[in-house]
Amino acid sequence: MSWRLLTGYQLCRLRLFRKPQPALKIRPSSVCVTYGTDCQSNKENKRTVETLRACSVDIGKICRLKGWVLLEEETYAEEIANILKELGANQTVIASILERCPEAIVCSPAAVNTKRKLWQMVCKTKTELIQLIEQFPESFFAVKDQENQKLNVQFFQELGLKNVVITRFLTTASSIFHNPVENNKQMIGVLLESYLNLGGSEANAKVWLLKLLSQNPFIVLSSPTAVGEVLKFLQGQGFTDSEVLQLLSKLKGFLFQLQPGSIQNSISFTKTTFECTDHDLRQLVVKCPALLYYPAPVLEERIQALLKEGISVAQIRASPMVLELTPQIIQYRIRKLNSLGYGIKDGHLASLNGTKKEFEANFSKMQAKQGRPLFNPVASLKVEE
């Protein structure tokens, strides 16, 4: 495709397609996962339906969401409800959990009790535990590889991660606990070695690692080979060890999830667009790692959106962080600034930057400043007699 942005630069745009996965039959002994099917009342397990109704569960919701569980011959609805009750859940909470995660009733009580003990390794109280289960029932009722999950929890605790962080991982990044613990240990070792090889201080290594993990736990799913390839590529592009370490920290480890080919396309596009030298390019990338992270077509779309607002390439180059924002966010923020009479075309783009919270706070300050009187009308005037 031909770039529409001031140049004739050409890049190849790749598209990935996924074939839909066929539905699978899940037995009670399997990991609890999501499959949808219509209820067939003549084939429903009557005991299961009656037990769920006794728990005030809306059967219609289960039919619409995961009706297949009602067709299973062997279910544990009563046992699972009792486990939740033992943890302090009332009937309303139990019904809510089972309605949102019906597959819980095909998990064996033994497996669920094992999972309860696992989560209690990082939860201080039963109250905290049941609140987590209510928020993330699907994570709790994924009862596969529990011994490996336990080993990973112990490993992260030994590493120095706080229980509150591990709890967040269990609920929002559960896949890292299914990864073999030896693989996670190996990747942690690779990260520490890379940090030290890039000039990081040994005294600060553990603090750096724990911060990186808390920001991006999925980094442990990267491969040592991918890490080596990305580091070698960036060093081949002229980035110093210090600059690579800055990129690794600023991108929160997502750097290792990129492919050298994609990075090369983004670098080439940036260099051509901003007409900069190799040295200037590296400075831009270190200042705004988004130039490295986002694919060239995404960068082009965002630059084009800025140009349509009357912003120049020179302005973008002076404040490249603006490219971290989507065109929709840019348009919204420009309209808000225009409402105050602020001409973004003539000013610095820094006023557009920041998170939503940061932008709104800065906007409020600008708004208050604009409405402030030039003098205090109640202050006494100093008049020379």
From Swiss-Prot:
SMART domains with a match to the protein in the record: Mterf
GO CC, any one term: mitochondrial matrix
Pfam families: mTERF (PF02536)
Source taxon at top rank: Eukaryota
Subcellular location: Mitochondrion matrix, Mitochondrion nucleoid
Any one Gene Ontology molecular-function term assigned to this protein's record: DNA binding
InterPro entries for the chain: MTERF, MTERF_sf
Gene Ontology BP terms: regulation of DNA-templated transcription; termination of mitochondrial transcription
Keywords: Mitochondrion, Mitochondrion nucleoid, Transcription, Transcription regulation, Transit peptide
Transit sequence range: 1-35
UniProt cross-references to PANTHER family, sorted A to Z: TRANSCRIPTION TERMINATION FACTOR 2, MITOCHONDRIAL, TRANSCRIPTION TERMINATION FACTOR, MITOCHONDRIAL
Assembly description: Monomer.
Family the entry assigns: Belongs to the mTERF family.
Protein role: Binds mitochondrial DNA and plays a role in the regulation of transcription of mitochondrial mRNA and rRNA species.
Protein name as catalogued: Transcription termination factor 2, mitochondrial
Gene behind the chain: Mterf2
